């Protein structure tokens, strides 16, 4: 839905509209008013406006004049600004503020010469909302443990209310013996002392109990959230990962869930306890001394409010310090992760300087934070001591008039400090709860996503009757992250069974996109991809990728485990003999057995301990171990040296026998024996034929061959 709004001049002949009107009624009025007054290439209405693109042909002065008139009409119901200048300032400003707070925004351009200019609509990123229903699904399995923790927390809070009263009884016994010098002191003090010790012991047990239960609940909820989120992320289509950075996704799995777990445990334990103690101790204070309670009610909230403000400042400073620590960590992570590049350019000193600079900034911020905390704690101690002194002064006056006993004064002091600590804890927990809910909302946002391409579900073709014929029929496609850039345009191609088809062309022509559509990483915008006459959208994607198609990319990614497990990744149920057989087909068996640990050799993160040719041959073995009917080679040898390319090409020649093969080629020397070579340009096939046929045409293929030979490729 398009929203028209405030216009601001960008260039001499162009204006840009980038704000919306808050009212649908106002928006429709503006459109209708413009339709009556202006000459447009097409009528505008709220129901006729396209969601993604509009063509505007209204002269800019007319548009601005109508917008000003609308502002005057809508401002009649409100007091007018004192001057015309103020009107021109406040009118657009009000629209701007409203636009910042509400809904999506749009960007349009209108040329003063009435030329048609495309209008793009961009929806603002929606802030994720916290879902209590989703939280309930995670908490429900731990409900009994959670209820037990809540009951124990209430019990501990109730005991904390009783402890000041018991302390008062103890003080009264001591004061009576000091005043009267009568009776047996040890006998009189024994009963209240034993009761107080019993309360302390029971309070300790209850506190330990609810902390243990809450820890159990929090850890299990966090584990379930991590597992569920990771499952949701793995099920997302490739377009999702194109649009989101890996670091952000990992941060949701780690930092956000950790933040939510900590907030969840703190809010339930300390929040319930603090709230119970605050209410209970206030009641106790009133029964002990209504007069002192009145003074406390006046003073205490002011002090807590001031403490909350200072605490808010310190929390912001703490957040900045943590962000600076994260920057320093990022520098170190980048340097250590790319240590080979750092070493190759002798940049160790520069990386050290960068890291030291970030660490120094972090240290300075943390020193400032430490100073702030020290000042805050010092002032807090002064204020607390002043409160104690004031309470003793006022309580002493009441004691002098026999309105208050020494024990009651002691009880009042302890209870009032309990209230103050509880209120301060609640104010801190409020900020913690906000951060926790924000973190939870970010996690829940990804849990609710449904992939456009499902991971499983659909039909399967019996492998013994699978022929391997692939048809691309009138395919048009744009990547979801770049909808305005069409990669394939009415693309059609047939891969005959057990034949090799190569696609060549300049970079950006759409070659790798064809392979991605066959793997069903994406669905085409229009057209259909067929496998043995069936639309692949009706087939099970997991079966298609796991049993039918083998994919070998230009830069294979290996996992930081053994060679055996890396090859078995292509078929988890493969036996050791099947793994060895696949390695032999890929020309990898000899160099693998040359390792000290053979197939149990750990290849390091991303296969860092292997050469490019070795990694590529292990990747070929990984694809062959599942015996695929269709093989996709996406520039599988373009990154290798001549010797490695020769060995890998021998393996590929063996692997392609008896299979339908799609080759995405950069080095044209590797595809001269293909049954069909298709030359792509701008998303279309412009030439097709065998190597000799295309050379004889003297077209784009011949030009590419000539260009590569002049650059040193055979």
Swiss-Prot record:
InterPro entries recorded for this chain? AAA+_ATPase, ABC1_TM_dom, ABC1_TM_sf, ABC_transporter-like_ATP-bd, ABC_transporter-like_CS, P-loop_NTPase, Type_1_exporter
Primary location group: mitochondrion
Q: Name one GO cellular component term.
A: mitochondrial inner membrane
Enumerate the CDD domains for this protein: ABC_6TM_ABCB8_like, ABC_MTABC3_MDL1_MDL2
Which superkingdom? Eukaryota
- UniProt function note: ATP-binding subunit of the mitochondrial ATP-gated potassium channel (mitoK(ATP)). Together with pore-forming subunit CCDC51/MITOK of the mitoK(ATP) channel, mediates ATP-dependent potassium currents across the mitochondrial inner membrane. An increase in ATP intracellular levels closes the channel, inhibiting K(+) transport, whereas a decrease in ATP levels enhances K(+) uptake in the mitochondrial matrix. Plays a role in mitochondrial iron transport.
Which SMART domains does the record match to this protein? AAA
Q: How does it assemble?
A: Component of the mitochondrial potassium channel (mitoK(ATP)).
Q: What is this protein called?
A: Mitochondrial potassium channel ATP-binding subunit
Species of provenance: Danio rerio
């Amino acid at each position: 839905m398009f929203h028209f709004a405030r216009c601001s001049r960008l260039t001499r002949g162009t204006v840009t509209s980038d704000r919306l009107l808050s009212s649908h009624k106002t928006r429709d009025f503006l459109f209708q008013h413009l339709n009556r007054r202006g000459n447009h290439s097409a009528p505008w209405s709220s129901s006729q406006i396209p969601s993604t693109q509009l063509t505007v042909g209204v002269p800019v002065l007319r548009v601005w004049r109508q917008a000003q008139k609308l502002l005057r009409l809508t401002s009649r119901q409100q007091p007018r600004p004192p001057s015309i200048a103020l009107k021109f300032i406040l009118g657009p400003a009000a629209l701007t503020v409203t636009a910042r707070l509400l809904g999506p925004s749009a960007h349009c351009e209108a040329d003063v010469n009435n030329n048609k200019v495309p209008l793009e609509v961009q929806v603002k990123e929606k802030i994720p909302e916290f879902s209590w229903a989703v939280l309930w699904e995670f908490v429900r399995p731990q409900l009994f443990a959670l209820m037990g923790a809540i009951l124990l927390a209430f019990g501990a809070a109730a005991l904390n209310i009783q402890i000041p009263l018991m302390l008062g009884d103890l003080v009264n016994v001591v004061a009576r013996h000091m005043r009267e010098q009568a009776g047996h002191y040890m006998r009189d003090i024994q009963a209240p002392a034993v009761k107080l010790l019993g309360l302390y012991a029971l309070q300790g047990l209850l506190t330990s109990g609810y902390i243990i239960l809450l820890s159990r609940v929090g850890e299990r909820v966090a584990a379930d959230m991590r597992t569920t989120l990771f499952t949701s992320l793995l099920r997302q289509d490739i377009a999702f990962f194109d649009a989101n950075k890996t670091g952000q996704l990992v941060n949701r799995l780690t930092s956000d869930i950790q933040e939510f777990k900590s907030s969840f445990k703190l809010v339930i334990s300390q929040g319930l306890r603090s709230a119970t103690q605050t209410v209970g101790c206030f009641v106790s204070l009133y029964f002990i001394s209504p007069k002192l309670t009145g003074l406390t009610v006046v003073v205490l909230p002011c002090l807590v409010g001031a403490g909350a403000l200072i605490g808010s400042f310190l929390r912001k400073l703490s957040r900045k310090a943590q962000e600076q620590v994260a920057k320093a960590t990022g520098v170190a992570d980048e340097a250590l992760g790319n240590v080979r590049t750092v070493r190759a350019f002798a940049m160790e000193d520069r990386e050290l300087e960068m890291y030291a600079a970030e660490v120094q900034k972090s240290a300075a911020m943390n020193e400032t934070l430490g100073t702030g905390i020290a000042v805050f704690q010092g002032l807090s101690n002064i204020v607390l001591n002043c409160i104690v002194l004031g309470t003793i002064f006022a309580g002493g006056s009441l004691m002098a008039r026999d309105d208050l006993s020494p024990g009651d004064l002691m009880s009042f002091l302890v209870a009032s400090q309990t209230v103050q600590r509880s209120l301060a804890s609640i104010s801190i927990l409020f900020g913690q709860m906000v951060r926790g809910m924000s973190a939870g909302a970010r996690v829940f946002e990804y849990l609710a996503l449904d992939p456009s391409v499902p991971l499983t579900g659909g039909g399967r073709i019996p492998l013994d009757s699978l022929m391997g014929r692939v048809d691309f029929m009138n395919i048009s496609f744009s990547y979801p992250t770049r909808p305005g850039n069409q990669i394939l345009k009415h693309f059609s191609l047939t891969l005959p069974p057990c034949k090799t088809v190569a696609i060549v062309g300049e970079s950006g022509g759409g070659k790798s996109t064809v392979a991605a559509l066959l793997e069903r990483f994406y669905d085409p915008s229009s057209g259909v991809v067929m496998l043995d006459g069936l639309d692949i959208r009706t087939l099970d994607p997991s079966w298609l990728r796991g049993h039918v198609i083998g994919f070998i990319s230009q830069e294979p990614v290996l996992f930081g485990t053994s060679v055996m497990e890396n090859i078995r990744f292509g078929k988890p149920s493969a036996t050791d003999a099947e793994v060895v057989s696949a390695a032999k087909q890929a020309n990898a068996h000899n160099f693998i057995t040359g390792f000290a640990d053979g197939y149990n050799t750990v290849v390091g993160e991303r296969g860092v301990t292997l050469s490019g040719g070795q990694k590529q041959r292990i990747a070929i073995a990984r694809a062959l171990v599942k015996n695929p009917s269709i093989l996709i080679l996406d520039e599988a040898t373009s990154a290798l040296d001549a010797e490695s390319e020769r060995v890998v090409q021998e393996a590929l020649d063996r692997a392609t026998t008896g299979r339908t093969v799609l080759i995405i080629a950069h080095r044209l020397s590797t595809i001269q024996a293909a049954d069909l070579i298709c030359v792509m340009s701008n998303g279309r096939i412009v030439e097709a034929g065998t190597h000799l046929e295309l050379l004889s045409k003297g077209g784009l293929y011949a030009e590419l061959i000539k260009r590569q030979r002049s650059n040193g490729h055979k």
